[in-house]
A protein has these predicted regions:
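Conserved Class I S-adenosyl-L-methionine-dependent methyltransferase catalytic core
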Residues: 6, 10-117
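Key DNA-contact positions within bacterial/archaeal DNA-binding proteins
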Residues: 3
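Class I SAM-dependent methyltransferase SAM/SAH-binding core
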Residues: 118-120, 130-164
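Class I SAM-dependent methyltransferase "Motif I" SAM/SAH-binding loop
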Residues: 123-127
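Short, flexible micro-motifs
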Residues: 73, 128-130
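Generic recognition of stable, solvent-exposed alpha-helical segments in well-folded globular domains
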Residues: 58, 81, 128, 147-150
Length: 164
């Protein structure tokens, strides 16, 4: 509802969390706020971390039972917001660092990938890192592995969208 959104934004502006321009009657975020809260590709994007926290709260009863019984809690037993949040949280860091910083820091790895290597991404989740590497190193072959079938389905769909 537009009225509720305006009231909420007005409260945020009164608290100094957003800016209000009375001339245009618009609200805005600072560049830094937008970088962290609204630009999904930014390396500082934090809403994925919020999804992870929400999933942890949803799992409190399961975690308590796991601690009481010693039976553990499988990755697959978590709320789906954990899997989506994990991908949203880590993907920007992978995009910003994996190809440009981390791989070059590993002696000889970049040259092998450029020449054509076979790579297994174990625990690939939604496939963000696998896709980033496959796009950067087309001479190499990348296969993602994960025991969580719904995550593998998301990874396959993402790979198909990028035509990998």
């Amino acid at each position: 509802d537009a009225r509720y959104v305006r009231e909420w934004l007005s409260a945020q502006a009164a608290s100094g969390y957003v800016q209000y321009d009375p001339a245009s009657e618009t609200f805005s975020l600072s560049e830094e706020q937008a970088f962290a809260l609204a630009q999904e590709g930014s390396p500082a994007f934090i809403p994925g971390a919020v999804q992870i926290a929400v999933a942890q709260f949803k799992a409190i009863a399961k975690m308590a039972a796991a601690m009481r019984t010693g039976l553990g809690l499988g990755w697959h037993e978590h709320d789906s917001s954990l899997f989506h949040g994990t991908e949203r949280f880590f993907r920007p860091g992978y995009a910003a660092n994996l190809v440009g910083q981390w791989i070059p820091a590993l002696e000889g790895v970049q040259a092998r990938l450029e020449a054509g290597a076979r790579v297994a991404d174990v625990g690939c989740g939604h496939g963000a890192s696998t896709i980033i590497m496959a796009q950067a190193f087309p001479a190499s072959s990348f296969v993602g592995f994960d025991y969580h079938a719904p995550s593998v389905e998301v990874a396959r769909a993402s790979a198909a969208k990028t035509r990998l």
